[in-house]
Amino acid sequence: MSATFTLGQLAERLGATLRGAEAKVITGLATLQEARPEQLSFLANAQYRKFLAQTQAGAVLLSAADAEGYAGDALIVANPYLAYAQLSHLFDRKPKAAPGIHATAQVADDAQVDPSASVGPYAVIESGARIGAEVSIGAHCVVGARSVIGDGGWLAPRVTLYHDVQIGKRVVIQSGAVIGGEGFGFANEKGVWQKIAQIGGVTIGDDVEIGANTTIDRGALSDTLIGNGVKLDNQIMIAHNVQVGDNTAMAGCCGISGSTKIGKNCMIAGGVGMVGHIEVCDNVFVTGMTMVTRSITEPGAYSSGTAMQPAGEWKKSAARIRQLDEMAKRLRELEKQLAAVTQTANVSSDA
């Protein structure tokens, strides 16, 4: 059953200025284009302002500036997107598991599971693992030996934690994620690869979110480290001994090579690749599909590659790129010739 709240209740939760009917009932959230009269919407991006006048939403989360041009009911806040984020949890229909261990789950005798935790069907909790208060472990999850999940954690079905993985409090991990797999470590002897045991672990801070099918490898010696408040999207690959600083966010399909250190409050857009053994300082924004091949020591935005253009124009640009080396040689030769002519002219003038 959907949750219901009055506009007055929502305004009180947000500390918002209510303009409209306090008793109006709201049953959900939706976009400006799709909202129905019983739903609340929001305007947080100027490109969607064109939909405001025609929206059927029962009320809209608006900044004071946008509220001036809107005649309907509104909750006026400083940051509509943040307000939407705060209210979204009220209408989240995600099933909540009941405390207890399912009859089909396999829990080692020496594992510790808090009575308030939930362990789903066919989950496996190995020897020495510790599960904190109000943790939810979905069906078919594996929690490896000596691994720890802090209070309030939530694992979707089919999450795998290898041995010696330390998870902080209120961590969310989506299906298919694998934490603590062996890092890619090999030594070459006369063309033959010799495996290096990966004897470190993974340590993850509090309030971290890890997306579906993301992998975080265990350290070769010391732990791979993920700081507090880090947000990792789907299908990200974090190699062994990477360090990600507090409150850094990383979008899907990024690949971070071994022993690279990423600072705090960074934003790494989708498809970014980073080579190993480099450092990225705090407060860096890396745009999508950028290849980071050296350390970044100054905050700011960084990009590589070329932006989209019509295929014909791109082919011409690519052809010119292949010609750059020859053009550079010709330019250097012309500069030499020009310098010689200039020197001769100067000598003649002096004479």
From Swiss-Prot:
<keyword id="KW-0012">Acyltransferase</keyword>
<dbReference type="InterPro" id="IPR007691">
    <property type="entry name" value="LpxD"/>
</dbReference>
<dbReference type="Pfam" id="PF04613">
    <property type="entry name" value="LpxD"/>
</dbReference>
<keyword id="KW-0441">Lipid A biosynthesis</keyword>
<dbReference type="GO" id="GO:0016410">
    <property type="term" value="F:N-acyltransferase activity"/>
</dbReference>
<comment type="similarity">
    <text>Belongs to the transferase hexapeptide repeat family. LpxD subfamily.</text>
</comment>
<keyword id="KW-0677">Repeat</keyword>
<keyword id="KW-0444">Lipid biosynthesis</keyword>
<comment type="function">
    <text>Catalyzes the N-acylation of UDP-3-O-acylglucosamine using 3-hydroxyacyl-ACP as the acyl donor. Is involved in the biosynthesis of lipid A, a phosphorylated glycolipid that anchors the lipopolysaccharide to the outer membrane of the cell.</text>
</comment>
<dbReference type="InterPro" id="IPR020573">
    <property type="entry name" value="UDP_GlcNAc_AcTrfase_non-rep"/>
</dbReference>
<dbReference type="InterPro" id="IPR011004">
    <property type="entry name" value="Trimer_LpxA-like_sf"/>
</dbReference>
<comment type="pathway">
    <text>Bacterial outer membrane biogenesis; LPS lipid A biosynthesis.</text>
</comment>
<keyword id="KW-0443">Lipid metabolism</keyword>
<dbReference type="InterPro" id="IPR001451">
    <property type="entry name" value="Hexapep"/>
</dbReference>
<protein>
    <recommendedName>
        <fullName>UDP-3-O-acylglucosamine N-acyltransferase</fullName>
        <ecNumber>2.3.1.191</ecNumber>
    </recommendedName>
</protein>
<feature type="active site" description="Proton acceptor">
    <location>
        <position position="240"/>
    </location>
</feature>
<dbReference type="GO" id="GO:0016020">
    <property type="term" value="C:membrane"/>
</dbReference>
<dbReference type="GO" id="GO:0009245">
    <property type="term" value="P:lipid A biosynthetic process"/>
</dbReference>
<keyword id="KW-0808">Transferase</keyword>
<comment type="subunit">
    <text>Homotrimer.</text>
</comment>
<dbReference type="Pfam" id="PF00132">
    <property type="entry name" value="Hexapep"/>
</dbReference>
